[in-house]
Amino acid sequence: MKKRFSKVIIAKHLFDGINEKDYEGYLCLSGNHIVEKKAGKPEKDILNQAQEVLNFRDELVMPGITDTHTFFTGYAIYHVGADFSKVTDNEEGCCILRKYEQKRHPEGALLGHGWNPEMWDRQNGEEMLEEKFPNKAVIIFSADRSCCIMNQKARNIYQFSAETCYPESYYRIMREYLNDREFIKKEFSDYMKMMNSRGVTTVKEMGFDDFYGFTDYLKELEDSEDLNLRTFFMSQPVGEGMNLVYARRMREQFTGNKIRFSGFNRMTDGTIASYKGDLKEPYENQDFCCKDPVPYEEIEKDVLAADAEDFRWSLHAQGDGAVGKITEIYQKCKKVQGKLKNRHAITDMEFTDPKDLEILGRIGVTAELYFQIMSLDPADVLINNIKQTIGTERGKYYWNRRKMQDSGMNLSGATDLPLLLTSIPESIYYSCGG
Protein backbone atom coordinates (compact mmCIF):
# COMPACT_ATOMS: atom_id res chain seq x y z
CA MET A 1 0.00 0.00 0.00
CA LYS A 2 1.34 3.45 -0.92
CA LYS A 3 2.31 5.52 2.10
CA ARG A 4 0.89 9.04 2.56
CA PHE A 5 4.15 10.76 3.42
CA SER A 6 7.51 10.59 1.70
CA LYS A 7 9.13 11.87 4.86
CA VAL A 8 8.32 12.82 8.45
CA ILE A 9 10.73 15.15 10.24
CA ILE A 10 10.58 15.08 14.04
CA ALA A 11 12.31 17.91 15.89
CA LYS A 12 12.91 18.71 19.53
CA HIS A 13 13.51 22.28 18.37
CA LEU A 14 11.24 23.37 15.51
CA PHE A 15 11.19 27.03 14.48
CA ASP A 16 8.48 27.87 11.96
CA GLY A 17 9.16 31.58 11.43
CA ILE A 18 5.70 32.47 12.75
CA ASN A 19 6.05 31.81 16.46
CA GLU A 20 8.77 33.75 18.25
CA LYS A 21 10.24 30.66 19.93
CA ASP A 22 11.04 27.13 18.84
CA TYR A 23 8.97 24.19 20.04
CA GLU A 24 8.84 20.40 19.83
CA GLY A 25 6.97 19.33 16.72
CA TYR A 26 7.00 17.51 13.41
CA LEU A 27 6.57 18.01 9.66
CA CYS A 28 4.99 15.64 7.16
CA LEU A 29 6.21 15.87 3.57
CA SER A 30 4.78 14.58 0.33
CA GLY A 31 7.46 14.95 -2.31
CA ASN A 32 8.72 18.53 -2.10
CA HIS A 33 5.67 19.84 -0.23
CA ILE A 34 5.02 20.18 3.51
CA VAL A 35 1.48 18.84 3.92
CA GLU A 36 1.24 18.87 7.70
CA LYS A 37 2.93 20.74 10.58
CA LYS A 38 2.04 20.13 14.21
CA ALA A 39 3.38 20.68 17.70
CA GLY A 40 4.17 17.72 19.95
CA LYS A 41 5.20 14.20 19.05
CA PRO A 42 3.65 12.37 16.08
CA GLU A 43 1.24 9.51 16.68
CA LYS A 44 2.32 6.01 15.69
CA ASP A 45 -0.17 6.11 12.82
CA ILE A 46 1.67 9.11 11.32
CA LEU A 47 5.01 7.32 11.52
CA ASN A 48 3.59 4.18 9.93
CA GLN A 49 2.46 6.23 6.94
CA ALA A 50 5.97 7.62 6.28
CA GLN A 51 8.49 6.19 3.85
CA GLU A 52 11.29 7.79 5.89
CA VAL A 53 11.48 9.25 9.39
CA LEU A 54 14.17 11.73 10.46
CA ASN A 55 14.58 12.55 14.14
CA PHE A 56 16.49 15.63 15.32
CA ARG A 57 17.06 16.26 19.02
CA ASP A 58 19.92 18.78 19.22
CA GLU A 59 19.56 20.51 15.85
CA LEU A 60 17.25 23.42 15.01
CA VAL A 61 14.82 22.62 12.20
CA MET A 62 13.64 25.79 10.45
CA PRO A 63 12.45 27.17 7.08
CA GLY A 64 14.92 28.04 4.36
CA ILE A 65 16.55 31.47 4.53
CA THR A 66 16.28 34.29 1.99
CA ASP A 67 19.35 36.36 1.07
CA THR A 68 17.99 39.62 -0.31
CA HIS A 69 21.09 40.75 -2.23
CA THR A 70 23.30 38.27 -4.10
CA PHE A 71 25.43 38.54 -7.23
CA PHE A 72 26.01 35.18 -8.91
CA THR A 73 27.48 36.92 -11.96
CA GLY A 74 30.34 38.22 -9.80
CA TYR A 75 30.70 34.95 -7.89
CA ALA A 76 31.24 33.09 -11.18
CA ILE A 77 34.45 35.09 -11.79
CA TYR A 78 36.10 32.94 -9.09
CA HIS A 79 35.81 29.96 -11.44
CA VAL A 80 35.57 31.32 -14.98
CA GLY A 81 37.91 29.96 -17.65
CA ALA A 82 41.17 28.14 -16.93
CA ASP A 83 42.67 27.67 -13.46
CA PHE A 84 45.88 29.68 -12.88
CA SER A 85 46.16 29.14 -9.13
CA LYS A 86 49.44 27.18 -9.39
CA VAL A 87 51.09 29.19 -12.15
CA THR A 88 54.49 30.68 -11.27
CA ASP A 89 55.92 31.78 -14.63
CA ASN A 90 55.13 32.73 -18.21
CA GLU A 91 55.82 29.29 -19.63
CA GLU A 92 53.24 27.65 -17.37
CA GLY A 93 50.74 30.42 -18.02
CA CYS A 94 51.13 30.22 -21.79
CA CYS A 95 50.80 26.42 -21.73
CA ILE A 96 47.52 26.58 -19.78
CA LEU A 97 46.10 29.20 -22.14
CA ARG A 98 47.02 27.15 -25.22
CA LYS A 99 45.40 24.01 -23.80
CA TYR A 100 42.27 25.92 -22.81
CA GLU A 101 42.00 27.54 -26.23
CA GLN A 102 42.37 24.19 -28.01
CA LYS A 103 39.80 22.52 -25.76
CA ARG A 104 37.10 25.22 -25.62
CA HIS A 105 37.66 27.38 -28.74
CA PRO A 106 36.00 30.47 -27.18
CA GLU A 107 34.70 33.02 -29.67
CA GLY A 108 35.44 35.90 -27.32
CA ALA A 109 38.17 36.33 -24.73
CA LEU A 110 40.39 33.67 -23.23
CA LEU A 111 39.48 33.83 -19.54
CA GLY A 112 41.14 32.54 -16.41
CA HIS A 113 40.84 32.66 -12.63
CA GLY A 114 42.89 32.06 -9.50
CA TRP A 115 45.99 34.10 -10.44
CA ASN A 116 48.27 34.74 -7.45
CA PRO A 117 50.19 38.05 -7.91
CA GLU A 118 52.82 36.92 -5.40
CA MET A 119 53.62 33.81 -7.45
CA TRP A 120 53.46 35.18 -11.00
CA ASP A 121 54.49 38.76 -11.77
CA ARG A 122 51.81 40.73 -13.59
CA GLN A 123 54.16 42.73 -15.79
CA ASN A 124 55.95 39.59 -16.95
CA GLY A 125 52.64 37.89 -17.60
CA GLU A 126 51.29 40.77 -19.66
CA GLU A 127 54.48 40.91 -21.74
CA MET A 128 53.98 37.23 -22.54
CA LEU A 129 50.35 37.84 -23.53
CA GLU A 130 51.37 40.62 -25.94
CA GLU A 131 53.95 38.35 -27.55
CA LYS A 132 52.03 35.06 -27.68
CA PHE A 133 48.42 36.28 -27.99
CA PRO A 134 48.54 39.64 -29.83
CA ASN A 135 45.27 39.01 -31.70
CA LYS A 136 43.26 37.32 -28.95
CA ALA A 137 41.83 39.09 -25.90
CA VAL A 138 43.07 37.47 -22.67
CA ILE A 139 41.91 38.25 -19.12
CA ILE A 140 43.12 36.29 -16.08
CA PHE A 141 41.45 37.29 -12.81
CA SER A 142 43.24 37.17 -9.47
CA ALA A 143 42.03 34.74 -6.80
CA ASP A 144 40.21 37.54 -4.94
CA ARG A 145 38.89 39.21 -8.17
CA SER A 146 40.48 42.54 -7.21
CA CYS A 147 42.86 42.74 -10.18
CA CYS A 148 43.82 40.84 -13.30
CA ILE A 149 46.42 40.14 -15.96
CA MET A 150 45.23 41.27 -19.39
CA ASN A 151 46.59 42.22 -22.79
CA GLN A 152 46.02 45.35 -24.84
CA LYS A 153 43.55 43.56 -27.10
CA ALA A 154 41.34 42.90 -24.05
CA ARG A 155 41.68 46.50 -22.85
CA ASN A 156 40.55 47.80 -26.22
CA ILE A 157 37.55 45.49 -26.56
CA TYR A 158 36.23 45.44 -22.99
CA GLN A 159 37.26 48.98 -22.01
CA PHE A 160 38.66 48.38 -18.53
CA SER A 161 42.12 47.86 -17.07
CA ALA A 162 43.86 45.83 -14.39
CA GLU A 163 43.62 48.92 -12.17
CA THR A 164 39.82 49.18 -12.62
CA CYS A 165 38.96 45.52 -12.17
CA TYR A 166 35.49 45.52 -10.59
CA PRO A 167 32.13 44.23 -11.91
CA GLU A 168 30.70 47.56 -13.10
CA SER A 169 33.84 48.07 -15.22
CA TYR A 170 34.12 44.58 -16.73
CA TYR A 171 30.41 44.13 -17.43
CA ARG A 172 31.14 43.75 -21.17
CA ILE A 173 32.60 40.27 -20.68
CA MET A 174 29.60 38.98 -18.71
CA ARG A 175 27.54 38.16 -21.78
CA GLU A 176 30.30 35.77 -22.89
CA TYR A 177 30.54 33.60 -19.80
CA LEU A 178 26.84 33.82 -18.87
CA ASN A 179 26.06 32.29 -22.28
CA ASP A 180 28.78 29.64 -22.09
CA ARG A 181 26.32 26.84 -21.38
CA GLU A 182 28.96 24.24 -20.55
CA PHE A 183 30.43 26.51 -17.88
CA ILE A 184 27.29 28.15 -16.54
CA LYS A 185 25.26 24.96 -16.09
CA LYS A 186 27.80 23.48 -13.66
CA GLU A 187 28.60 26.84 -12.08
CA PHE A 188 25.00 27.68 -11.24
CA SER A 189 24.37 24.14 -10.02
CA ASP A 190 27.37 24.39 -7.68
CA TYR A 191 26.19 27.83 -6.57
CA MET A 192 22.74 26.50 -5.67
CA LYS A 193 24.26 23.59 -3.73
CA MET A 194 26.58 25.97 -1.86
CA MET A 195 23.68 28.25 -0.92
CA ASN A 196 21.48 25.30 0.10
CA SER A 197 24.28 23.99 2.31
CA ARG A 198 24.16 27.33 4.15
CA GLY A 199 20.40 27.14 4.65
CA VAL A 200 19.51 29.49 1.79
CA THR A 201 16.58 28.47 -0.42
CA THR A 202 15.67 31.87 -1.92
CA VAL A 203 17.76 34.76 -3.25
CA LYS A 204 17.17 38.21 -4.71
CA GLU A 205 19.76 38.12 -7.46
CA MET A 206 21.32 41.14 -9.16
CA GLY A 207 21.75 41.02 -12.94
CA PHE A 208 23.30 43.92 -14.82
CA ASP A 209 21.13 45.52 -17.51
CA ASP A 210 19.17 42.74 -19.30
CA PHE A 211 21.16 39.98 -17.52
CA TYR A 212 22.95 39.41 -20.83
CA GLY A 213 20.92 36.36 -21.82
CA PHE A 214 21.12 34.48 -18.51
CA THR A 215 17.33 34.68 -18.17
CA ASP A 216 17.07 32.18 -21.05
CA TYR A 217 18.80 29.62 -18.86
CA LEU A 218 16.65 30.58 -15.86
CA LYS A 219 13.56 29.98 -17.98
CA GLU A 220 14.80 26.49 -18.84
CA LEU A 221 15.41 25.80 -15.15
CA GLU A 222 12.09 27.19 -13.94
CA ASP A 223 10.13 23.94 -14.01
CA SER A 224 13.12 21.64 -13.75
CA GLU A 225 13.98 19.28 -10.91
CA ASP A 226 17.46 20.82 -11.06
CA LEU A 227 16.24 24.14 -9.60
CA ASN A 228 16.90 24.18 -5.85
CA LEU A 229 17.02 27.93 -5.31
CA ARG A 230 14.09 30.29 -5.78
CA THR A 231 15.52 33.20 -7.74
CA PHE A 232 13.92 36.64 -7.77
CA PHE A 233 16.14 38.80 -9.96
CA MET A 234 16.59 42.55 -10.36
CA SER A 235 18.01 44.62 -13.19
CA GLN A 236 20.89 46.91 -12.22
CA PRO A 237 21.44 49.50 -14.97
CA VAL A 238 25.18 49.62 -15.75
CA GLY A 239 25.87 49.64 -19.48
CA GLU A 240 22.54 51.27 -20.28
CA GLY A 241 19.77 53.15 -18.52
CA MET A 242 16.70 51.66 -16.85
CA ASN A 243 14.99 49.43 -19.40
CA LEU A 244 11.23 49.26 -18.84
CA VAL A 245 10.69 47.32 -22.08
CA TYR A 246 12.91 44.55 -20.70
CA ALA A 247 11.14 44.75 -17.33
CA ARG A 248 7.72 44.29 -18.91
CA ARG A 249 8.99 41.31 -20.89
CA MET A 250 10.46 39.66 -17.79
CA ARG A 251 7.25 40.20 -15.81
CA GLU A 252 5.27 38.49 -18.56
CA GLN A 253 7.80 35.69 -18.96
CA PHE A 254 8.16 34.72 -15.29
CA THR A 255 4.84 34.39 -13.49
CA GLY A 256 5.42 31.45 -11.13
CA ASN A 257 6.74 31.34 -7.57
CA LYS A 258 10.19 29.90 -8.37
CA ILE A 259 11.71 32.54 -10.63
CA ARG A 260 10.40 36.06 -10.96
CA PHE A 261 11.49 39.54 -12.02
CA SER A 262 11.68 41.78 -8.96
CA GLY A 263 12.41 45.26 -10.31
CA PHE A 264 15.49 47.49 -10.38
CA ASN A 265 18.59 48.06 -8.26
CA ARG A 266 21.00 50.99 -8.14
CA MET A 267 23.87 52.40 -6.13
CA THR A 268 23.53 56.02 -5.01
CA ASP A 269 26.34 57.24 -2.74
CA GLY A 270 29.47 55.41 -1.52
CA THR A 271 31.03 54.46 1.80
CA ILE A 272 31.38 56.93 4.64
CA ALA A 273 34.95 55.76 5.32
CA SER A 274 35.91 56.95 1.80
CA TYR A 275 34.02 60.25 2.30
CA LYS A 276 31.70 59.23 -0.55
CA GLY A 277 28.64 58.68 1.62
CA ASP A 278 26.26 61.60 1.17
CA LEU A 279 25.67 63.35 4.52
CA LYS A 280 23.17 65.99 5.62
CA GLU A 281 25.94 67.93 7.38
CA PRO A 282 29.66 68.11 6.45
CA TYR A 283 32.14 65.45 7.52
CA GLU A 284 34.19 66.09 10.65
CA ASN A 285 36.84 68.76 9.99
CA GLN A 286 35.75 69.02 6.34
CA ASP A 287 33.64 71.49 4.36
CA PHE A 288 31.84 68.97 2.13
CA CYS A 289 29.05 66.41 2.54
CA CYS A 290 30.08 64.01 -0.22
CA LYS A 291 33.14 63.68 -2.46
CA ASP A 292 31.12 62.60 -5.49
CA PRO A 293 27.82 64.11 -6.65
CA VAL A 294 24.76 61.82 -6.65
CA PRO A 295 22.30 62.21 -9.60
CA TYR A 296 19.14 62.34 -7.48
CA GLU A 297 17.02 63.92 -10.23
CA GLU A 298 17.80 61.02 -12.57
CA ILE A 299 17.16 58.51 -9.78
CA GLU A 300 13.81 60.09 -8.91
CA LYS A 301 12.74 60.11 -12.55
CA ASP A 302 13.55 56.38 -12.89
CA VAL A 303 11.91 55.40 -9.60
CA LEU A 304 8.66 57.22 -10.35
CA ALA A 305 8.52 55.86 -13.92
CA ALA A 306 9.01 52.29 -12.65
CA ASP A 307 6.57 52.78 -9.78
CA ALA A 308 3.93 53.99 -12.24
CA GLU A 309 4.15 50.57 -13.91
CA ASP A 310 4.24 48.70 -10.57
CA PHE A 311 7.93 47.78 -10.59
CA ARG A 312 10.00 47.86 -7.41
CA TRP A 313 13.22 49.73 -6.79
CA SER A 314 15.97 48.89 -4.33
CA LEU A 315 18.32 51.84 -3.81
CA HIS A 316 21.69 51.41 -2.10
CA ALA A 317 22.37 54.26 0.32
CA GLN A 318 24.97 54.71 3.08
CA GLY A 319 24.90 58.30 4.31
CA ASP A 320 22.02 60.00 6.13
CA GLY A 321 21.81 62.51 3.28
CA ALA A 322 21.30 59.77 0.69
CA VAL A 323 18.76 57.96 2.87
CA GLY A 324 16.92 61.27 3.38
CA LYS A 325 16.76 62.00 -0.36
CA ILE A 326 15.49 58.47 -1.06
CA THR A 327 12.89 58.90 1.67
CA GLU A 328 11.61 61.99 -0.16
CA ILE A 329 11.50 60.08 -3.46
CA TYR A 330 9.66 57.09 -2.02
CA GLN A 331 7.07 59.37 -0.42
CA LYS A 332 6.05 60.38 -3.96
CA CYS A 333 5.36 56.77 -5.00
CA LYS A 334 1.95 55.09 -5.17
CA LYS A 335 0.41 54.05 -1.86
CA VAL A 336 -2.43 51.85 -0.66
CA GLN A 337 -3.81 52.83 2.76
CA GLY A 338 -0.66 54.84 3.44
CA LYS A 339 1.79 52.05 2.55
CA LEU A 340 3.88 51.85 -0.62
CA LYS A 341 2.09 49.73 -3.18
CA ASN A 342 5.30 48.39 -4.71
CA ARG A 343 7.35 47.63 -1.58
CA HIS A 344 10.45 49.65 -2.47
CA ALA A 345 13.61 49.02 -0.46
CA ILE A 346 16.82 50.68 0.72
CA THR A 347 20.01 48.64 0.93
CA ASP A 348 22.83 48.96 3.49
CA MET A 349 21.70 52.10 5.42
CA GLU A 350 25.04 52.59 7.15
CA PHE A 351 24.27 55.95 8.81
CA THR A 352 20.72 57.28 9.08
CA ASP A 353 18.58 60.05 10.57
CA PRO A 354 16.00 58.63 13.03
CA LYS A 355 13.35 61.01 11.63
CA ASP A 356 13.74 59.46 8.19
CA LEU A 357 13.48 55.96 9.65
CA GLU A 358 10.12 56.85 11.20
CA ILE A 359 8.82 57.98 7.81
CA LEU A 360 10.21 54.90 6.07
CA GLY A 361 8.55 52.64 8.62
CA ARG A 362 5.27 54.49 8.28
CA ILE A 363 5.13 54.04 4.49
CA GLY A 364 6.36 50.44 4.57
CA VAL A 365 9.90 50.56 3.16
CA THR A 366 12.06 47.43 3.48
CA ALA A 367 15.63 47.63 4.80
CA GLU A 368 18.07 45.23 3.13
CA LEU A 369 20.95 45.07 5.58
CA TYR A 370 24.45 43.62 5.27
CA PHE A 371 24.65 42.26 8.81
CA GLN A 372 27.87 40.30 8.19
CA ILE A 373 29.70 43.35 6.87
CA MET A 374 30.68 44.12 10.47
CA SER A 375 32.95 41.06 10.33
CA LEU A 376 35.23 42.59 7.69
CA ASP A 377 37.08 44.97 10.04
CA PRO A 378 38.13 44.86 13.72
CA ALA A 379 35.94 46.85 16.12
CA ASP A 380 38.62 49.45 16.85
CA VAL A 381 39.02 50.19 13.13
CA LEU A 382 35.26 50.69 12.73
CA ILE A 383 35.04 52.92 15.80
CA ASN A 384 37.98 55.06 14.66
CA ASN A 385 36.44 55.43 11.20
CA ILE A 386 33.21 56.67 12.75
CA LYS A 387 35.05 59.16 14.98
CA GLN A 388 37.11 60.53 12.09
CA THR A 389 34.28 60.85 9.58
CA ILE A 390 31.06 61.77 11.42
CA GLY A 391 32.12 62.03 15.08
CA THR A 392 30.80 60.30 18.19
CA GLU A 393 27.59 62.35 18.46
CA ARG A 394 26.33 61.48 14.99
CA GLY A 395 27.95 58.07 15.38
CA LYS A 396 25.11 57.07 17.72
CA TYR A 397 23.00 56.63 14.60
CA TYR A 398 25.45 54.35 12.80
CA TRP A 399 23.86 50.99 11.84
CA ASN A 400 20.81 52.05 13.83
CA ARG A 401 18.85 48.83 13.30
CA ARG A 402 17.04 49.11 16.61
CA LYS A 403 15.37 52.33 15.45
CA MET A 404 14.55 50.76 12.07
CA GLN A 405 12.79 47.91 13.82
CA ASP A 406 10.99 50.18 16.29
CA SER A 407 9.84 52.42 13.42
CA GLY A 408 8.10 49.51 11.70
CA MET A 409 10.52 48.92 8.85
CA ASN A 410 10.74 45.40 7.48
CA LEU A 411 14.33 44.28 8.15
CA SER A 412 15.87 41.67 5.86
CA GLY A 413 19.33 40.13 5.66
CA ALA A 414 21.62 40.51 2.65
CA THR A 415 25.27 39.76 1.91
CA ASP A 416 26.16 41.31 -1.46
CA LEU A 417 27.62 37.86 -2.15
CA PRO A 418 30.42 37.31 -3.15
CA LEU A 419 31.49 40.20 -0.88
CA LEU A 420 30.36 37.87 1.91
CA LEU A 421 29.12 34.28 1.83
CA THR A 422 25.78 33.84 3.56
CA SER A 423 26.12 32.65 7.16
CA ILE A 424 23.03 32.42 9.34
CA PRO A 425 25.00 32.27 12.64
CA GLU A 426 27.13 35.29 11.67
CA SER A 427 24.07 37.24 10.53
CA ILE A 428 22.30 36.62 13.83
CA TYR A 429 25.42 37.53 15.82
CA TYR A 430 26.12 40.78 14.00
CA SER A 431 22.49 41.82 13.58
CA CYS A 432 22.20 41.81 17.36
CA GLY A 433 25.22 44.07 17.79
CA GLY A 434 28.11 41.60 17.95
Question: PLM ranges: what are they?
Answer:
Residues 2-11, 15, 19-246, 271-305, ...:
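Divalent metal-binding segments
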Residues 37-40, 264, 349:
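Residue-level recognition of beta-strand microenvironments
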Residues 71, 258-276, 365-375:
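Non-cysteine beta-strand/loop elements that form the S-adenosyl-L-methionine
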Residues 125, 219-221, 248-250, 279-281, ...:
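Short secondary-structure boundary/capping segments
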Residues 134-135, 253-259, 283-288, 359-383:
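Extended low-complexity acidic/polar segments
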Residues 145, 235-239, 265-268, 350, ...:
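Glycine-rich beta-alpha junction loops
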Residues 175, 186, 304-314, 321-344, ...:
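His/Asp/Glu-enriched, well-ordered alpha-helical/loop segment
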Residues 221-224, 249-259, 307, 337-339, ...:
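Acidic (Asp/Glu)-rich catalytic clusters
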